[in-house]
C-alpha cells in the first residue's frame, strides 16, 4: 500500500511537471520575445504550486534541455501515461485483474504492437480498448485513495 501511494504521488507530480512544459512551450512559441523567465515562474507557480525564489532573475527555463534538443515533445510523456492507464484498465476488465498474464501479453502484441504505425495513436487506442483516449482511467489509477 505504501509503494502504491508513493507511485500515485510521483505520477501526479510528474503530470504537473509535464503540463508545465506544455503550457510554457505554447506561450514561448506564441511570443518568443517576452520575458521567458517571468513566464516560466508564472506557469510553475500556477501549475506546480511552487513559489519562485525571491530576487532570482536567471534563465531557469533554459536549464530544461528538452526545449532545445526535443522541442514540442513533453506532451507525449503524458499521452503515454494516459494510454497506459486505459490499456491497464481494459486488460483488467476484459482479460484478467492480473496484468502479467500470457493473454494480456498476446493482446498487447497482436492488437497494439503488431499494427505498428498503421493507425494514429488515437485510432489505435480506440481499436484496442473500444473507446477514444479517456483521461478518467489515469485519474482513477492515480487519484484514488489506497487504504
Model-derived regions: residue spans:
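C-terminal, non-catalytic "cap/extension" segments appended to globular domains
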Residues: 2-147
Amino acid at each position: 500500500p505504501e509503494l502504491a501511494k508513493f507511485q500515485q504521488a510521483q505520477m501526479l507530480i510528474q503530470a504537473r511537471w509535464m503540463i508545465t512544459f506544455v503550457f510554457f512551450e505554447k506561450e514561448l512559441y506564441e511570443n518568443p520575445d517576452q520575458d521567458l523567465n517571468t513566464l516560466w515562474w508564472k506557469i510553475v507557480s500556477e501549475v506546480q504550486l511552487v513559489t519562485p525564489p525571491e530576487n532570482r532573475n536567471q534563465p531557469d527555463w533554459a536549464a530544461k534541455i528538452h526545449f532545445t534538443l526535443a522541442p514540442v515533445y513533453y506532451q507525449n510523456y503524458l499521452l503515454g501515461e494516459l494510454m497506459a492507464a486505459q490499456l491497464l484498465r481494459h486488460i483488467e476488465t476484459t482479460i484478467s485483474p492480473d496484468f502479467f498474464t500470457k493473454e494480456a501479453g498476446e493482446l498487447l502484441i497482436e492488437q497494439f504492437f503488431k499494427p505498428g504505425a498503421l493507425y494514429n495513436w488515437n485510432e489505435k487506442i480506440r481499436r484496442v480498448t473500444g473507446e477514444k483516449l479517456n483521461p478518467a482511467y489515469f485519474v482513477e489509477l492515480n487519484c484514488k485513495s489506497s487504504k
